[in-house]
Amino acid sequence: MTARFHPSNTLPRSVTIWLCIVMAMIVIMVMVGGVTRLTQSGLSMVDWRPIMGIIPPLTQLDWQDAFAAYKQFPEYKTLNYGMTLSEFKGIFLMEYSHRVWGRLIGLVFMVPLMWFFIRGTVCGPLAWKLLGLLLLGAAQGAMGWIMVKSGLSD
């Protein structure tokens, strides 16, 4: 009988654990993304600030400013006209969690990947595959940004 291939037989344990954590985070992201889509929350954050965007509105004035900005876009005018600030907070926080989780996945993937490259833990074909996954993750983020931008203009 031949032995079945199992990734943990060939990868260092640290790499296997890291990839399993990233995989679990992606599964959670799919669920959060689905809820974001079903609640039509994706366009509630009308600006994209990759660095400073991690900080949500903190004061009542911040929330009012974010809501006023949202009211300027077609989604509010056609779908959510009459929405209250409290309702807006709900959809905003859904999209906020979606974006923050995406950034966190990027960090959890990229930082250990750099560490594994520096230490020589991953090299050869595996290194290229992991770099490809990093590029696919970046492309997914870019597609999300394009989807939001196009939704804000139509």
What spans do the regions from the language model cover?
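Short, Lys/Arg-rich, polar N-terminal cytosolic tail immediately upstream
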Residues: 1-11
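N-terminal signal-anchor transmembrane alpha helix
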Residues: 15-54
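Conserved histidines in hydrophobic membrane contexts and catalytic metal-binding motifs
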Residues: 33, 97-98, 140
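Interfacial helix-loop-helix junctions of multi-pass membrane proteins
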Residues: 36-47, 141-154
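Long, glycine/tryptophan/cysteine-rich extracytoplasmic
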Residues: 47-77
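Individual transmembrane alpha-helix segments
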Residues: 69-109
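Membrane-interfacial alpha-helical segments at the cytosolic side of multi-pass membrane proteins
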Residues: 103-120, 133
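Membrane-interfacial loop-to-transmembrane alpha-helix junctions, especially the N-terminal start
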Residues: 124-134
